[in-house]
């Protein structure tokens, strides 16, 4: 993705066997940082940037706004955690590449 762009990350939660997990009533947190030892540069949570769009299908969306990525460039680590019935699970990890763009917002 490019700095200053908005993006929606669509995630389907699956168990170890690949079956879809019902996430009804769950809360979610998503964060991005340079590494697991660095300060978080983007943070989203249920109701504030994260929406569960299909609870029985295990689907949630993380919405990144222009301002979230405007001043970022490079490789970032990101992960999402789901809390349900008192248990917390990491349901997504990965890399996020943010490139500079020639056209900048005024």
Language-model features: locations:
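Contiguous segments within soluble domain cores/interaction surfaces
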Residues: 1-106
């Amino acid at each position: 993705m490019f700095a200053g762009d908005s993006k929606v990350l669509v995630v389907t939660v699956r168990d170890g066997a690949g079956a879809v997990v019902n996430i009804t009533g769950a809360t979610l947190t998503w964060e991005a940082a340079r590494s697991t030892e660095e300060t978080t540069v983007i943070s989203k949570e249920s109701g504030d940037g994260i929406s569960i769009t299909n609870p029985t299908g295990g689907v949630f969306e993380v919405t990144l706004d222009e301002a979230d990525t405007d001043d970022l460039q490079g490789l970032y680590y990101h992960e999402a955690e789901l809390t349900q019935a008192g248990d917390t699970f990491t349901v997504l990890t990965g890399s996020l590449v943010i490139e500079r763009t020639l056209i900048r917002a005024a």
